[in-house]
Amino acid sequence: MDNERERQAAAAARVSGEAATARASAGLEPLVLASASPRRAEILRNVGWPFETQAADVDEQLRDGEDPTAYVERLAREKAEAVAARRLFGLVLGADTTVVVEGRVLGKPADDSEARAMLRLLGGRTHEVLTGVALVRAESKRVR
């Protein structure tokens, strides 16, 4: 499974890099996806938006007292800001998604065992999927 993810991520980076080059040569501002997620890249490809990807390295720990909505909004903003800080120009798109069940935020499972435990927790229960999105202009570092 990891090899398939790596293959998809490499293909997405290759395609997005080519699209970004074409966009830049046309004089258009580049869109940068602040994520290594093949799913997010797939969404942008499916809508036909040219982009490039740069992974953001941010602390994804839930802070004490932080509610789930504030959590995904903060992570989206921090990811976009981290990538924008390394760029001179362009629009940087950050996003984060989490699942909340019975008030508990479920992070990324560390391994297969934790993933199975999460699925058991979700079984037969209503849950929410929350996504935060932030757009940062690299030149001004202004967040939208």
Each predicted region: which residue ranges?
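Short glycine-rich, Thr/Ser-proximal phosphate-binding strand/loop in the N-terminal lobe
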Residues: 48-65, 142-144
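N-terminal G-site helix/loop of the GST-like fold
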Residues: 28-54
